[in-house]
């Protein structure tokens, strides 16, 4: 019954124009096909609309809180107060950081320059390493051995004279200041060496001899003929010359003896020479000569060298009036005075104006020191000067001169004892101007080697002294292995035999010619002990001089006590020297005990330092077997030439104690903060 009714309704809807969507036609199309409603008779049929598609809403980015709402909330106390607190905390923090930075800069001591921070290594280039098999050391040979030098913890290489020279006075008679002597290589070799040295993080300084030139120098040859500006480049004076005999203008003597005046046949005058007659002195009262020397300084600095050792600077000026110098022995017949030591050299050395020249050289070097990390070092050689005169080379607080004059007091000691070492140390430290930096040498090319001068037993103790004294340690090549002088009696070289003894070839190994060269000959003979005293052998020996040297240089590099600390010289006797190294803020002290006597000795350190502990640990010893063990401070036993570095802690450092205050020295006062891990000077 119901089914019949549904069928009738469906038919009725169809008959009255109801349209259905079959799923393939859009509703809009169906509506367009609908008959006009006016033509369609009204009916009560129900029309079922199709479902509409949902419309998507466009989502816009969040534009933030409206300004009016923002102001409404921002003014509330719960937001305003935290905001203001954070703002002022930020401001205060910024000012605190700025203030702390400024304070650290103000209170921190000046950082050590490169020439202060580590040891220097002096090389006589003809004797270090031969690279081209001609029996002579050269620049390439030095470059080949840079790894060895680096392994010694060296920071600066110092090369002695390598300028073009006719071989007089070990190349200190320079024929051309801007050329490399061919025996050492070429300018390109030098440039390569400079680059290699800097690549290793090292610095390079070279010798410079401004006082004189070779008589082969073009300047002198032109001066002999009175050619233009060169006429007065040297010191000329009228003199009498007859029958091969010269009567000089005065009694001035050469360092090597006899008159310092030499007659020249070309110019018919005498020229002045403080050294050999082949080394005429330049006339530094001529401004043109001063400018020439400055140009030479600039030339080598532009090549990349990091500094100079200025040689023989006390001879730069002489008195104008040529007065005779006073005899040491006034009763001696004047004609018999021929030795340099027989006169007081008041008119030929350290004249007024000489230091002005040195300061002028310093200012020229400063033109190349303006770049960060490129400070140019200046050292001066001042042999045989009094301590007071030597210290003048440091300059003044407001006038810069040398960074330091080279200290050869230890290098010239012929007799070792506790007293002589103590006097050599105190004579420098007590006279050095405040704030200046000391340096120490135990050998050099102009002195006999340490082993031959005082004995091989003291090599280790002297190296320990070198690295534990305040200041810059300077090592002459071969001293790290205990090389000695050679024994020679007859040489073809045109030199004083005694001056050659400390210049023998470096002893690298026990092969032919000590590994110095592959040639069949060497310019000087090697030392006969090279089979046992050489680098290769000592590398493998725990008790060797080389191994101790490396340990000492490493300790010096790592310990602020040794580079920045106080030095307190406590006692000396005929055998020993005792001193401490200490620094405020570091809870340890190094107590150094060295025996320079001719026999063993026993020290009671309790008598010297009342509050020293009964037992002290050995940090480093010349006898490696005792390293790390303890010693009884009531009776410290030292063999001949033995040295100990003892480590302990002390509540009140010695430089604060009245009893020792006058015996303590420091160049730049500093204290250490372990909390901040920094040094500061306001202490």
Swiss-Prot record:
Entries under InterPro entries matching the protein: Glyco_hydro_13_cat_dom, Glyco_hydro_b, Glycoside_hydrolase_SF, O16G_dom_2
GO annotation, cellular component aspect: apical plasma membrane; brush border membrane; vacuolar membrane
SUPFAM superfamilies recorded: (Trans)glycosidases
Topology relative to the membrane: Single-pass type II membrane protein
Sequence ranges on the Cytoplasmic membrane side: 1-86
Residues annotated for Ca(2+) binding in this entry: 211, 281, 315-316, 318
Record-annotated membrane-spanning stretches: 87-107
Ranges in the topological domain labelled Extracellular: 108-683
Subcellular location(s) of the protein: Cell membrane; Apical cell membrane
Glycosylated residues in this chain: 211, 238, 258, 329, 510, 520, 574
Region (Disordered): 1-50
Function of the molecule: Acts as a chaperone that facilitates biogenesis and trafficking of functional transporter heteromers to the plasma membrane. Associates with SLC7A9 to form a functional transporter complex that mediates the electrogenic exchange between cationic amino acids and neutral amino acids, with a stoichiometry of 1:1. SLC7A9-SLC3A1 transporter has system b(0,+)-like activity with high affinity for extracellular cationic amino acids and L-cystine and lower affinity for intracellular neutral amino acids.
Name of protein: Amino acid transporter heavy chain SLC3A1
Phylogenetic lineage: Eukaryota, Metazoa, Chordata, Craniata, Vertebrata
């Amino acid at each position: 019954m119901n089914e019949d009714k549904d069928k009738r309704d469906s038919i009725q809807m169809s008959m009255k124009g109801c349209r259905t969507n079959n799923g393939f036609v859009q509703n809009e199309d169906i509506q367009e096909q609908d008959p006009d409603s006016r033509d369609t008779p009204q009916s009560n049929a129900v029309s079922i609309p199709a479902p509409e598609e949902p419309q998507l809403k466009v989502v816009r980015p969040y534009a933030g809180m409206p300004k009016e709402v923002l102001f409404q909330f921002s003014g509330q106390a719960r937001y305003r107060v935290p905001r203001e607190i954070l703002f002022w905390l930020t401001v205060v923090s910024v000012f605190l950081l700025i203030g702390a930075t400024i304070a650290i800069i103000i209170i921190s001591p000046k950082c050590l320059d490169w020439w202060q921070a580590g040891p220097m290594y002096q090389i006589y280039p003809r004797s270090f390493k031969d690279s081209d098999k001609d029996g002579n050391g050269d620049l390439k040979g030095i470059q080949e051995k840079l790894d060895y030098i680096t392994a010694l913890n060296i920071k600066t290489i110092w090369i002695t004279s390598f300028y073009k020279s006719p071989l007089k006075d070990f190349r200190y008679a320079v024929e051309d200041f801007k050329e490399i002597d061919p025996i050492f290589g070429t300018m390109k070799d030098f440039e390569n060496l400079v680059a290699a040295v800097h690549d290793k993080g090292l610095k390079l300084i070279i010798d410079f001899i401004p006082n004189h030139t070779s008589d082969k120098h073009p300047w002198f040859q032109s001066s002999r003929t009175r050619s233009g500006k060169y006429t007065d480049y040297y010191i000329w004076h009228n003199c009498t010359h007859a029958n091969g005999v010269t009567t000089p203008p005065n009694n001035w003597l050469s360092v090597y003896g006899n008159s310092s005046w030499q007659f020249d046949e070309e110019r018919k005058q005498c020229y002045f020479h403080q050294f050999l007659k082949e080394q005429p002195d330049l006339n530094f009262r001529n401004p043109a000569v001063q400018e020439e020397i400055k140009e030479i300084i600039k030339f080598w600095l532009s090549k990349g060298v990091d500094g100079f050792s200025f040689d023989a600077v006390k001879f730069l000026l002489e008195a104008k009036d040529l007065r005779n110098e006073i005899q040491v022995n006034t009763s001696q017949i004047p004609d018999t005075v021929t030795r340099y030591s027989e006169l007081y050299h008041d008119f030929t050395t350290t004249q007024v104006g000489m230091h002005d020249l040195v300061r002028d050289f310093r200012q020229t070097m400063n033109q190349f020191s303006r770049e960060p990390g490129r400070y140019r070092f200046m050292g001066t050689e001042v042999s045989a000067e009094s301590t007071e005169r030597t210290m003048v080379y440091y300059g003044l607080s407001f006038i810069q001169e040398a960074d330091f004059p080279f200290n050869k007091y230890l290098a010239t000691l012929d007799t070792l004892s506790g007293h002589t070492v103590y006097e050599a140390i105190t004579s420098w430290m007590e006279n050095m101007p405040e704030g200046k930096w000391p340096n120490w040498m135990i050998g050099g090319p102009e002195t006999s080697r340490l082993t031959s001068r005082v004995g091989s037993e003291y090599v280790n103790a002297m190296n320990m002294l070198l690295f534990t004294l305040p200041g810059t340690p300077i090592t002459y090549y071969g001293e790290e292995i205990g090389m000695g002088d050679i024994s020679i009696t007859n040489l073809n070289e045109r030199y004083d035999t005694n001056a050659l003894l400390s210049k023998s070839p470096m002893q690298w190994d026990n092969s032919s010619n000590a590994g110095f060269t592959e040639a069949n000959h060497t310019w000087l003979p090697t030392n006969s002990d090279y089979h046992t005293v050489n680098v290769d052998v000592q590398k493998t020996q725990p008790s060797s001089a080389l191994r101790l040297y490396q340990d000492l240089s490493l300790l010096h590099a790592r310990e602020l006590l040794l580079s920045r600390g106080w030095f307190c010289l406590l006692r000396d006797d005929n055998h020993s020297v005792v001193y401490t190294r200490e620094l405020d803020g570091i809870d340890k002290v190094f107590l150094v005990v060295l025996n320079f006597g001719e026999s063993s000795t026993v020290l009671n350190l309790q008598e010297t330092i009342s509050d020293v502990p009964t037992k002290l640990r050995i940090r480093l010893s010349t006898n490696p077997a005792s390293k790390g063990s303890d010693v009884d401070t009531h009776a410290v036993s030292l063999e001949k030439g033995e040295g100990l570095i003892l480590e302990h802690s002390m509540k009140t450092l010695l430089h604060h104690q009245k009893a020792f205050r006058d015996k303590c020295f420091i160049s730049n006062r500093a204290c250490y903060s372990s909390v901040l891990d920094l040094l500061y000077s306001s202490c």
